Amino acid sequence: MKIVKISPRGYCYGVVDAMVIARNAALDTSLPRPIYILGMIVHNKHVTDAFEEDGIITLDGPSRLDILDKIDSGTVIFTAHGVSPEVKQRAKEKGLTTIDATCPDVTKTHDLIEAKKAEGYHVIYIGKKNHPEPEGAVGIAPDIVHLIERADDLKTLEIPTDKILVTNQTTMSQWDVQHLMEDIQKKFPTAEFHKEICLATQVRQEAVAKQADVADLTIVVGDPKSNNSNRLAQVSQEIAGTKAYRVADVSEINLEWLQGVENVAVTAGASTPTPITKEVIAFLEQYDPMNPATWERVRKVPLQKILPRVKVKKEQ
């Protein structure tokens, strides 16, 4: 079996930065305890489990405000997906120490929404409902930001001005966003468009589109909650024309997928730890359908190998 290692794949700078911020927080003895992450720091359970070992507690819930209600003291880390001004204000009112790990690409979108609100615009925001990134973006200006996920949402959308900005969640499929923007243009011809697919997401999607077409199967390594991982599987199927499955790690690979397969493409979401992806590749490289000794699929990567290394500051 030939393995096509799609490149680039895996961690983006925003994810690594967020994890380094959280690791440094865990090592900072001056920060009030306990230390919480408001939702998953990045959408990968292996990462959140590793942070639990570091003493950082991940809390999840239907919204960031709901999660904040569970916290009475300590330090709160805002995730890479960003939060609304209301969340920041609520944390301040509760007397919590806050650390912001928002991805710079997300912050750029928030700043754009604020600037356009000041100019009297309404904003159509393309994103996934119940995902934390759109929650934070809509929360920047909930009175003028309209979240849509698919073309059907446009049917009932009415906006009381011709001053309209269209932007999007950074981890969406660039092809889905383009198609939706074309539909929006037809209904709102005066709209201005700012496509905000982050560069890391874009190049990973384009790599799958161009490199997975030679494979019989694509395996995307990523968490089920990771939107960018799910979009990579979608791109493989819809753009490259190659059947795709998403797995959290090697243990989720179904041997039936590999029957009759000669070429397997492997990629990974931007929040997927590199050792987890390497373990998947190593399994596929040694797999022999005629040798049961090669069929074992057990994640063996220790949690301490998941998180990026940080330098411990020496006391003066």
UniProtKB/Swiss-Prot annotation:
The keyword Iron applies. Isopentenyl diphosphate binds at H43, H81, H131, S226, N228, S271. Its cofactor is [4Fe-4S] cluster. Dimethylallyl diphosphate binds at H43, H81, H131, S226, N228, S271. GO terms for molecular function: 4 iron, 4 sulfur cluster binding; 4-hydroxy-3-methylbut-2-enyl diphosphate reductase activity; metal ion binding. Its EC number is 1.17.7.4. It comes from the Bacteria. InterPro entries: LytB/IspH. GO terms for biological process: dimethylallyl diphosphate biosynthetic process; isopentenyl diphosphate biosynthetic process, methylerythritol 4-phosphate pathway; terpenoid biosynthetic process. The keyword Iron-sulfur applies. It is an enzyme of class 1 (oxidoreductase). Binds 1 [4Fe-4S] cluster per subunit. (2E)-4-hydroxy-3-methylbut-2-enyl diphosphate binds at H43, H81, H131, T170, S226, N228, S271. Keywords: 4Fe-4S, Iron, Iron-sulfur, Isoprene biosynthesis, Metal-binding, Oxidoreductase. PANTHER family: 4-HYDROXY-3-METHYLBUT-2-ENYL DIPHOSPHATE REDUCTASE (PTHR30426:SF0). This is 4-hydroxy-3-methylbut-2-enyl diphosphate reductase. The gene is ispH.
